[in-house]
Structures are given as structure tokens and as C-alpha cells.
Amino acid sequence: MKQPLRVMIIPIVAWICQAGAQDLKPVQLPPPQKEIGKPLMQVLSLRHSSRDFDPKPLLPQDLSNLLWAADGINRGESGKRTAPSAMNWQETDVYVILSDGAFLYDAKANSLNPVIAGDVRALAGTQGFVKGAPLTLVYVVDYARMTKANDEDKKLYSAADVGFIAENAYLYCASQGFAVVVRGSVDRPVLSERLRLRPDQKIILAQTVGYPK
């Protein structure tokens, strides 16, 4: 009985290492806890940005809850998300940048699909605190999914959709007392290359999350 308990309380980075992040295997997240949190009006009063992060990695359960709140599936029969998207394009991908590598959030499987191994946190922001924070979410839009939209509409609607996701993450963090800040300062050319993005995939924003210092 002791071994399962130890596994459940280890931080997310160590947990990913045990799951084989270095050989690029998917990592299954625990089911999100949907019955937790403070009342909405209290959460709105608590929402704020913070740039002071404890370097301690997030626990697997906290990461699962955060990702579900940001853009998880809340209607299983239709696959629709906690954040709205124009025409239900669902054009935004959430990349999870940890000290061990970059992962792509799979909302349907509630899992992390490894993209690249290695610490690329410094590429997820130009401010000094980013490379020491445990987690940055990078919001990437895929214009190829936005069928029948012209170039101007793609930029407009995708930017709004990313904003909805980022605000969901903000509200979850406010509810749980986490530190969080959304940023436009990202080394887009270099990070896009490292994430192997296509020309029609664009990094819009990044959002750094962690326990408060």
C-alpha cells in the first residue's frame, strides 16, 4: 500500500519521468476534479497576475484540473469545451512546457502527448522569471481548421478564442490560490521551430503558472 501512495503525491515532472517522457510516450493525467473551487464572484474578486513562482512542479492532479478548466471537454456527447470557439473550430492547441520537455494537451484522452524532450522553458518567454517557473502554457492556433474564414477573420476569432482559454486558466488559478500571468512576450520564431509548427500554426499567447512563492 505504501508504493501507490508515494506515486500519487510526487510532482508532475518526476511523474512524467517515470512514465517515460524521454522516450516520448504519452502521459495519462488523472481525471479532473470538477466539484472543487470557490464561488464565481469570489474567484473574480481574487483574479490577478503574479510573476513570483515557487519552482516546485505542479502535482499531476493540479495540472489535470488546470488544463480541463482552461480548455477541457465539458460535454462529452459533442466534444465541446469549457472555452467557446467561433464556429466550434476548436483551432487552439495547448502546449504544456515543463522542465523535462514540451507536451501537447489532448483534451479527449485527458493526456499529455510529448513533442520534444529537454528544457525549453526559456523559449516560452523573454522575461527572466519564465525559465524558473514550473509550467508555461503556450496557446497555438491552427488556421487550417478555420474553414471558410478569410485571413482577417482567422486572426480576429482565434485571438478571441485564445483569450477565453487564458481567462479560464486565470479563474482556476484564482480559485486554487496559484500564481499565474498571461504574456505576449514569447520567442515565437525559435519556439515555433522547436515545437515543429507548420507555417499556418501560430503562437498567440503564453501563460505561466505555478504555486506562489
Model-derived features with residue positions:
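Short coil/turn connectors at secondary-structure junctions
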Residues: K131-P134, D200-K202
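Small-aliphatic-rich amphipathic alpha-helix that forms the alpha element of a beta-alpha
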Residues: R47, L66, V94, L135-Y139, ...
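Positively charged n-region of N-terminal signal peptides that target proteins for export
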Residues: M1-R6
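Bacterial N-terminal signal peptides
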Residues: V7-I16
